[in-house]
């Protein structure tokens, strides 16, 4: 399958903004406050949503003709962050504290994705090794998160040297260009065994997914 992408919607799925209008009965946040915006608003009714897995909502993309019901994915099934004004469910908003710039706040949800994968789902323990495949925004922030959690070594693979360089700046201990080396063999050499403790696949490339497995 594929994403139910609709070209009529303005893109931008992880972003921040300033609240300029509130819906009826909204009192959790105030006008003028800065917020980071999570991509998904689940329908709240299907089995997945009731289990807390709203990013896999069974009603993905079905708005039922209303902003108040149905699943929405910013930039995919409703207008996203590149529009001037966007309507978002209160459950998708994260208040941005003072001291964090707008530019930094834009990365809150992306960093949260990496943190959730490594810490909550993965249960990473300091001293365990991590390979991150793909040096895009989530992959690069996964490097920073892994280092913060005490992972060692932290290895980044990509096919672009500029992304590998950014990865080193963010804390990657080792970087591998997948065009130049056999990543699986190199990781086995580095680990001195079958491989690393964790692989976080962030590229979406079929080859990288197979190698991660």
Please describe what each predicted stretch is.
Residues 2-50, 55, 97-99:
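Glycine-rich beta-strand-centered segment in the early N-terminal region that forms part
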Residues 33, 84, 173, 197:
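Conserved acidic residues
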Residues 183-193:
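Conserved amphipathic alpha-helix within the SDR
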Residues 28, 38-92:
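Cysteine-cluster motifs in flexible loop/terminal segments that predominantly coordinate metals
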Residues 194-200:
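Short SAM/SAH-binding signature in class I
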Residues 91-93, 97-181, 185, 198:
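Mid-domain Rossmann-like dinucleotide-binding core that forms the NAD(H)/NADP(H) cofactor-binding site
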Residues 206-213:
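Rossmann-fold NAD(P) dinucleotide-binding segment
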Residues 38, 200-202:
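Short, well-ordered coil/turn residues at beta-beta hairpins
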């Amino acid at each position: 399958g594929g994403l139910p992408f609709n070209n009529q919607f303005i893109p931008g799925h992880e972003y921040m903004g300033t609240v300029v209008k509130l819906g009826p009965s909204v009192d959790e946040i105030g006008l003028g406050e800065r917020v980071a915006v999570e991509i998904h608003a689940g329908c709240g009714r299907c089995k997945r949503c009731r289990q807390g897995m709203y990013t896999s909502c069974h009603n993905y993309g079905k708005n039922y003709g209303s902003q108040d019901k149905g699943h929405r994915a910013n930039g995919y099934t409703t207008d996203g962050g590149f529009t001037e004004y966007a309507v978002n469910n209160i459950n998708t908003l994260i208040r941005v504290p003072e001291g964090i710039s707008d530019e930094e706040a834009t990365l809150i949800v992306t960093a949260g994705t990496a943190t959730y994968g490594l810490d909550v789902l993965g249960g990473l323990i300091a001293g365990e090794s991590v390979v991150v495949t793909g040096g895009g925004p989530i992959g690069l922030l996964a490097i920073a998160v892994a280092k913060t959690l005490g992972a060692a070594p932290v290895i980044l693979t990509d096919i672009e040297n500029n992304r590998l360089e950014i990865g080193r700046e963010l804390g990657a201990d080792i970087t591998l260009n997948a065009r130049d080396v056999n990543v699986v063999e190199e990781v086995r050499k580095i680990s001195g065994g079958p491989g690393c403790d964790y692989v976080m696949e962030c590229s979406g490339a079929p080859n990288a997914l197979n190698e991660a497995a």
